């Protein structure tokens, strides 16, 4: 196996991929308009998608997309907001905190259970703290409720308690804890 990280660009020939989730597959491979959402997001500068491909097997192992985000006081539980704000000097407290969002993260069925998702999150923690590429303090994710336990095992915390009928839960990881570990 020769895994390689590749920045997706429109027109790139994506190797076969199936994570058994139609929405996550569709983001990368197809939509009703026949243009993948990853393609649209790249053209409109909304998100950047990265592929991890096995160059020997010529298949996509996993992919993830990242985009700029912010944690806003108005949408955050007061307890969570206070927990975030206490970690910063008073002079730097504000009504929002800069973050980078993991817009999508999917691992091919063949590679699930082999720590690829965990490795991607570890890579992102390192990537956004090494030379501080975007000036973000947090990584956020709208995690599917079925994936909440996975993100918690990677030290993400719930930012907003979801309603019973919500499909996702807003979670965050404080990059400062990665820097100081």
Model region roles, listed by residue range:
Residues 63-104:
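Conserved acyl-donor/pantetheine-binding loop and adjacent beta-alpha core of acyl/acetyltransferases
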Residues 1-20:
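Conserved N-terminal entry element of GNAT/NAT acetyltransferase domains
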Residues 45-65, 78:
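Conserved beta-hairpin
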Residues 121, 128-143:
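Conserved GNAT acetyl-CoA-binding A-motif
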């Amino acid at each position: 196996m020769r895994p390689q990280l590749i920045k997706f660009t429109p027109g790139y020939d994506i190797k076969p991929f199936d994570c058994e989730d139609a929405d996550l597959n569709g983001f990368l491979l197809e939509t009703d308009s026949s243009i993948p959402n990853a393609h649209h997001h790249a053209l409109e500068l909304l998100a950047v998608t990265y592929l991890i491909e096995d160059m020997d097997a010529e298949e996509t192992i996993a992919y993830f997309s990242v985009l700029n985000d912010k944690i806003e006081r108005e949408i955050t539980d007061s307890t969570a907001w206070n927990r975030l704000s206490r970690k910063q000097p008073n002079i730097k407290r504000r009504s929002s905190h800069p973050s980078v969002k993991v817009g999508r993260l999917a691992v091919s069925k063949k590679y699930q259970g082999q720590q690829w998702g965990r490795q991607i999150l570890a890579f992102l923690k390192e990537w956004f703290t090494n030379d501080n590429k975007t000036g973000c303090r947090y990584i956020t994710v709208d995690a599917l409720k079925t994936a909440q336990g996975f993100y918690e095992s990677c030290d993400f915390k719930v930012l907003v308690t979801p309603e019973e009928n919500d499909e996702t839960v807003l979670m965050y990881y404080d990059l400062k804890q990665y820097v100081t570990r």
